[in-house]
């Protein structure tokens, strides 16, 4: 356990945790994970009681208490099969639209999760329109064609309606997962020019309103490094602020601090972290500090949700279309049925268990955290901190120390200085009631 005790004043040499005087304007709306086709496939193979126990651990209040889920519109790279909801060439009237293939195991598993967590926030992302709406005619790679924008908006509205008929409410939709990459045609993907995305968002917003759907649109859904693209879209198409006013980001390139530039110019836009998960062959079970740092940075820079990647995969990171080597939040061994857990799972044990939906985030920093140049080139990584005030008035500090030595910290709270020692390679939770 970490050491924490009150002290009469500041302690020389201990780093100071600084939290802002005021919380961020928008309250935090929850942590989650992607419920991909592959995850549903794996869930469906589990014995009923094992699955119930696992899902209760992930979504129950005594477990991770996740409250957000990302769904896929048709196939993603983490699906057991490749399909859209209308693979009939040039079916612009969408007469052959059908979600039947989701009914085998995708919808049943999602409904099981919704039954366990009735208030879960579900948003959805398409990896590709039907191939016939794109250059090249394939779901794997290619560009979205402008002439199909209106038809594709109808396609998405149909998807939302079909899911809602079955008791699955889609709170938000992203136009396209990662619109700036085609992944060399290895997986369902589609490149969208920013002009095309902006025009499509306007059309989709119109059709959602006409259909009396309150589903929100979260733009972009790609890397932090693309923040300038989002800024350009809002400047070039001011109507997007009313039609959307939300942007979603992944962590594969860039850093969360880039989002400050968006907030400076458009303080009323909402931000979400929508994808980031463990790698199967890279410290899979022990990378909790990586995720403690990432979650802290995302929350400190205004992300209102934080959603990981696959909920559950097998020991080979499958099934998937690729191949790719992501790990699931948990791993189900296909031979033994044994469950093992990622470092990200253990980090959620801190963040999502203790930071409640509706919490107010106080951006945090740690003063004097830089290493001495005497240590060059073996510098430590900075200790990170996140602070949240929950709806029940409890105040939570999440401290991540990724280094091989303990971190000596101090924090002023409730008219009292507190001395804190964060253990090496640790994520720690401190609660002030």
Give short role names for the model-derived ranges.
Residues 2-170, 202:
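N-terminal catalytic cores of secreted or lumenal carbohydrate-active enzymes
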Residues 74-78, 128-131, 177-181, 222-226:
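Short, internal active-site loops enriched in acidic
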Residues 1-18, 122-124, 154-162, 166-171, ...:
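Substrate-binding and catalytic surfaces of secreted/luminal carbohydrate-active proteins
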Residues 129-137, 141, 148-149, 177-197:
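Aromatic-lined, polymer-binding surfaces characteristic
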Residues 174:
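Ser/Thr-glycine-rich phosphate-binding loops at phosphate-binding pockets of nucleotides
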